[in-house]
Amino acid sequence: MNINFTLISQAMAFAIFIWFTVRFVWPPLMRAIENRQKTIAEGLAAGERGKRELELASQRSGDVVREAKQRASDIIAQAEKRAAEIVDEAKVAAREEGDRILVGAKAEVEQEVFRAKEVLRQQVAGLALAGAAKILRREVDEKAHAELLASLKAEL
């Protein structure tokens, strides 16, 4: 009888222990396990989101770098084009300035030639007058014969 009573009392104590455990101990343990599972799941999800965001950020940074390189090459191309335009404009301006200086120099040379011819005409007229005076053996009055001298200058 002792074994039976002991066995039954042990079974009842075990049943009370199970009831107590299921009633008071098991729910907090399950809540703790579920909270831990939820925390772990959220951590894994956050890790995945972080991974995706890192990939997107990496892709965006690559796009930004490519765009910056493209803009830089465009700016360099525009600068080179503008430099070529400035050089061409300078060449045109220099050519125009050279032409203007050449025209001025030609005009100045023509004026000098005209002045030299005028001086030569006067000298030739003077020589002709001197020659005529020697031929006639008399002095020709320059004032009296100014009209004759002017016509001689015009012919020369």
Swiss-Prot record:
Pfam families tied to this protein: ATP-synt_B
Family: Belongs to the ATPase B chain family.
Subcellular location: Cell inner membrane
GO cellular component: plasma membrane; proton-transporting ATP synthase complex
Protein name: ATP synthase subunit b 1
Biological role: F(1)F(0) ATP synthase produces ATP from ADP in the presence of a proton or sodium gradient. F-type ATPases consist of two structural domains, F(1) containing the extramembraneous catalytic core and F(0) containing the membrane proton channel, linked together by a central stalk and a peripheral stalk. During catalysis, ATP synthesis in the catalytic domain of F(1) is coupled via a rotary mechanism of the central stalk subunits to proton translocation. Component of the F(0) channel, it forms part of the peripheral stalk, linking F(1) to F(0).
InterPro entries xref list: ATP_synth_B-like_membr_sf, ATP_synth_b/b'su_bac/chlpt, ATP_synth_F0_bsu_bac, ATP_synthase_B_chain
Topology class, membrane: Single-pass membrane protein
Encoding gene, per UniProt annotation: atpF1
UniProt keyword Coiled coil, yes or no: no
The entry's keywords: ATP synthesis, Cell inner membrane, Cell membrane, CF(0), Hydrogen ion transport, Ion transport, Membrane, Transmembrane, Transmembrane helix, Transport
Self-association and partners: F-type ATPases have 2 components, F(1) - the catalytic core - and F(0) - the membrane proton channel. F(1) has five subunits: alpha(3), beta(3), gamma(1), delta(1), epsilon(1). F(0) has three main subunits: a(1), b(2) and c(10-14). The alpha and beta chains form an alternating ring which encloses part of the gamma chain. F(1) is attached to F(0) by a central stalk formed by the gamma and epsilon chains, while a peripheral stalk is formed by the delta and b chains.
Main subcellular location of this protein, as a coarse class: membrane
One MF annotation (Gene Ontology) recorded for this entry: proton-transporting ATPase activity, rotational mechanism
Transmembrane region(s): 5-27
